[in-house]
């Protein structure tokens, strides 16, 4: 259970493999703002190949408003790039969800990943609702259903918004709910939808929520992974093949045991 989530630092990992090399990016957000300070965000590459032509776009999650564009020529293995992101929080008080859409090139292929960041403005403001029990399941070969629940620790009814943070190719209608209401000390279930990846890569994303109370904004995030349909099917096929092999072995052992029992009975009768 993600109770309160007083997040000042969020790390999220993106992994891609192309040819013989890999790019493994970890994004780290440190942000406790006052007087409209910038958001400090770093991307480290722990893979074996460079991420080149890196472009970062920053967005406020609940408006999808572009707040800035940044770039660096490459992030080599074992190195990190540091970005100072302009904040649009201003003098507003509370916690706010931003996300950074990062596009990079590995070999001749271009990849896109997202990194969420909870920005604390004028102090730390933990949310009184948490995101829980999130599952991601395929509906068909193109669509995933994201189910979960929200639990309220507040003595008052909370009204807010909830959304998925995803790379653009995974976004679709039904990825956002507005105007949810959670009763005091109760669960509220939600369902969101995402497109499944067309390429055989696993994507990271997030469920984010936001609400306001007495002039202060509160936010929370929950990291998710979306696996391509083919990868999920291949994994299922692998399990089915293993189960079939085990069943065949058991049948063979039972037949051998039966033959031995019959031979013993014949020997006794003779």
For each feature predicted by the language model, list its residue ranges.
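Secretory targeting signatures
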Residues: 1-25, 233-270
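Surface-exposed, proline-enriched loop/turn segments that connect beta strands in immunoglobulin-like
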Residues: 25-30, 68-72, 131-135, 174-178
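Solvent-exposed, conformationally flexible loop/turn segments
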Residues: 28-36, 75-80, 93, 108, ...
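Aromatic/hydrophobic beta-strand junction motif of beta-rich domains
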Residues: 39-47, 146-152
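Hydrophobic beta-strand segments
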Residues: 54-59, 162-165
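Intrinsically disordered, low-complexity Pro/Gly/Ser/Thr-rich segments with frequent PxxP/GP/PP motifs
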Residues: 60-91, 168-198
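Short glycine/proline/serine/threonine-rich loop/turn segments at secondary-structure transition edges
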Residues: 91-99, 198-205
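Membrane-proximal extracellular "stem/stalk" segments
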Residues: 116-235
């Amino acid at each position: 259970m993600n109770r309160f989530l007083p997040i000042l630092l969020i790390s999220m990992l993106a992994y891609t493999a192309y040819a013989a090399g890999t790019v493994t990016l970890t994004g780290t957000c440190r942000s406790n703002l006052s007087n409209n300070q910038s958001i400090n965000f770093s991307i480290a590459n722990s893979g074996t190949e460079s991420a080149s032509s890196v472009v970062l776009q920053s967005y406020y999650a609940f408006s999808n408003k572009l707040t800035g564009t940044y770039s660096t020529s490459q992030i080599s293995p074992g190195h990190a790039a540091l970005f100072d992101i302009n904040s649009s929080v201003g003098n507003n008080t509370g916690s706010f969800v931003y996300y950074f859409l990062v596009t990079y090139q590995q070999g001749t292929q271009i990849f896109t990943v997202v990194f969420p960041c909870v920005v604390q403005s004028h102090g730390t403001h933990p949310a009184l609702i948490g995101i829980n029990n999130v599952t991601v399941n395929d509906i068909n070969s193109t669509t995933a259903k994201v189910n979960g629940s929200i639990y309220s620790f507040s003595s008052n009814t909370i009204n807010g918004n909830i959304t998925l943070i995803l790379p653009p190719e995974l976004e679709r209608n039904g990825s956002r709910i507005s105007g949810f209401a959670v009763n005091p000390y109760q669960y509220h279930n939600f369902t969101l939808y995402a497109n499944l990846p067309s390429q055989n890569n696993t994507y990271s994303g997030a469920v984010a929520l936001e609400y306001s109370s007495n002039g202060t904004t509160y936010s929370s995030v929950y990291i998710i992974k979306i696996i391509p349909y083919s990868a999920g099917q291949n994994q299922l096929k692998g399990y089915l093949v293993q189960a079939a092999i085990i069943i065949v072995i058991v049948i063979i052992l039972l037949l051998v045991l039966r033959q031995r029992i019959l031979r013993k009975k014949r020997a006794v009768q003779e």
